[in-house]
Amino acid sequence: MTSTAPGTPEPGTDPADPRTVVVRYVDAVARGDLEAVRASFAPDATWTYPGDVPLTGVYRGRDTIVDEFLLGAGVLFAPGGAPAVTLTNVIADGGQVVAEWTSKGLAATGRVYDNACLGVFTVADGLITSVREYADTQHVERSLFGGPQPG
């Protein structure tokens, strides 16, 4: 799995730098490093996933984000079909970081999951305090939950 796109600048050397924190988090997701993923979040962090699919909601607290949202999404993939996550763009301004990534894998439904995602991260004191994730939720519904195909 690739965690940074060719040409994407490497994160800074300060481990608390917001851009570095987000790049390190996405890299941990791509590697499947659950310990590093969990350590990326503040204890009271929030993750907002808008839309009207079963994953939609506001997840409050580091453990809820990891155990219910991230691991909950993980079981929607076929055995051995865990998505490959590729970071494609990162823009940072102070404590705000916008990251784009692709996620591709085989869903438990037998359908291919291939989505472009965007997250607006807030980072403070070297930890992610909030994320607002945007993705094609119609594709999420069709591929991960077996919703009707277009056409």
What are the language-model segments listed below?
Residues 21-31, 56-59, 75-78, 100:
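Short, mixed-charge, low-aromatic patches
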Residues 36, 42-92:
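A solvent-exposed, acidic/Ser-Thr-rich amphipathic alpha-helical stretch
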Residues 2-14, 70-151:
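A beta-strand edge to alpha-helix "cap/lid" segment located at domain peripheries
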Residues 11-15, 54-58, 62, 110:
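Alpha-helix initiation/capping motif
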Residues 25, 37-38, 45, 61, ...:
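Hydrophobic pocket/interface hotspot
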Residues 1-43, 147-151:
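Short, low-complexity N-terminal intrinsically disordered segments enriched in polar/charged residues
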